[in-house]
């Protein structure tokens, strides 16, 4: 969190207006106790179907949010914070039925199971916590035409949920 104060003074030096702004970086990490983070690869173990690029997209996005929004140093193993888990579900199913009796919408859903270790505060540890996101698309579209965009949106949402649950504490 950064604080910035701006004040306007009149000719006599009297403050006539003042504003204070705060910039939040999204995390509430005590950097005197927590300096490093380690990630295990989150494999795609979906019982539904598997889309090849998803595993790499997810792992990259997860690491990126911590590297961009914290001052933690990434280490290969045994970080002060440790994240591991797996993509447990990726599926599509019919959502709505149109007047013609056919499905008008398809829902795409992704679920990730996360284990989190905070070595400086074990009360914040999580074991098997699930995070999910879903998106809908018109059944007139082929999944291959919308999959990249929708999976990116779901990954972004899930990664933000994980970040908030592990280091944002709000």
Give the location of each predicted region.
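Bacterial N-terminal signal peptides
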Residues: 9-16
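Short, small-residue-biased leader/transition segments that mark boundaries at the very start
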Residues: 1-8
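Surface-exposed short loop/turn segments
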Residues: 25, 68-73, 77-126, 130-145
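Compositionally biased, intrinsically disordered linkers/stalks adjacent to structured regions
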Residues: 147-170
